[in-house]
Amino acid sequence: MHLSDDKHGVRADGYACVEMTFNGSVNNRQIGHTILHINRFDEDYVLPLPDVQVRGLLAACFYPEITGSYRIVSSSGYSSRITFSGAGLVRGARNRFEASVFHQKAPETHLYEISGVWSESWVIKDGKTGEILEIYQVDAPENGPAQMELEPIENQDPWESRRAWKDTIEQLQAGNLRAAAAAKHEVEAAQRLLREQEKDRGEEWRPLLFQSHPGASHQVFQDLTRGTQWTLSDIRTKGVWRLDNNLLAGLQKPYRPTHTSMQ
């Protein structure tokens, strides 16, 4: 994953390996992380990828729930601790969380405290005085998402995600889950067949823009997580994945001239 805003000097690079299990809920465990860099302050932040559950399957009322406790660590010396505690079988509200911001030298001295429901609203307080500094409403007009500017589907490369998953997206938007699953399976089956054909020819499939690096070379992660229980798990993710800027600079359509996502 790569996100960047050259105008504001913000960049994020991350990757994940997802493990799924089922025990009445769909459990998604994410192995990986994201590094956020802010040019203005020359700061790096290590962001965790939280575990997510899809609950309500038995009641046919699906909703997501983030679970567990996490830390965001920065090169500035400041950190945050976030604990998600959603609805249980007996009591509790959906999507609840509590968080605090502190300096790593004084983890018990909270500079800010945040609590609320991440899908609705939360309150930010001064950690020393308890004064409410801000109330954030997710659905407030001023907090709406920025408008996305996308090329028309017909102008996109067959490997761009919205075109590759066009049929699946359309069926999901129409509420046709069975048709969406069939469309999803068609793309996945085509990709598995391509991998088998490449293996038979002695070829190795390579990502278009990302390259894998040894975990020992990921110095930012090693520096920021030193002294914590955070592990890289680079063996399970087949290395640390980063965008290759040179490949991005030379990218031209068609991205893979000899293949589409379906053949």
Where are these regions (language model features)?
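Extended acidic, Ser/Thr- and Pro-enriched interaction/regulatory segments
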Residues: M1-Q263
